[in-house]
Amino acid sequence: MNVYNKADSFSLESDSIKDVIHDYICWLSMTDEMRPSIGNVFKAMETFKIDAVRYYDGNIYDLAKDINAMSFDSFIRSLQNISSKKDKLTVYGTMGLLSIVVDINKGCDISNIKFAAGIIILMEYIFDNTDMSHLKVALYRRIQRRYPIDDDEEDR
């Protein structure tokens, strides 16, 4: 971790969106007191939470509380739950939802670290290469525009 948390720029050619997401999820899993300050890359990642709220019809925090990756059964139920709502949430909203899930469950003990690892694995199942490309371009554009979330339709 700590490669991207203070980064202010992101390159479409040389940076990995998966690495950014992994670092970001690890950062989110820390308590607020333990989190190091962040740069533009993570500030732009935070905007995906806004997408989750915007695109989900119900209370996104209720849905987030139902997501759990601590056991195999709960992992599968969470995967099915997110997959069934992915068309409503969009790729951006799904990224935001999973960010909210980790933020809700943050902490210092080992179970929070396992939880964050479970969410990272869950993302590997949910996001395909096309989704990752969309996230990469959206992140790049949000950094360039200093985080506005009004991405073009072609980004989705």
From Swiss-Prot:
Interacts with host TANK, TBKBP1 and AZI2; these interactions prevent interferon production. Interacts with host STAT2. Belongs to the orthopoxvirus OPG029 family. Pfam families: Poxv_Bcl-2-like. Keywords: Early protein. Prevents establishment of cellular antiviral state by blocking virus-induced phosphorylation and activation of interferon regulatory factors 3/IRF3 and 7/IRF7, transcription factors critical for the induction of interferons alpha and beta. This blockage is produced through the inhibition of host TBK1, by binding host TBK1 adapter proteins TBKBP1 and AZI2, thereby producing a strong inhibition of the phosphorylation and activation of IRF3 and IRF7. Also acts as an inhibitor of the cellular response to type I IFN by interacting with host STAT2. The keyword rRNA processing does not apply. Induction: Expressed in the early phase of the viral replicative cycle. InterPro entries: Poxvirus_Bcl-2-like, Poxvirus_sf. This is IFN signaling evasion protein OPG029.
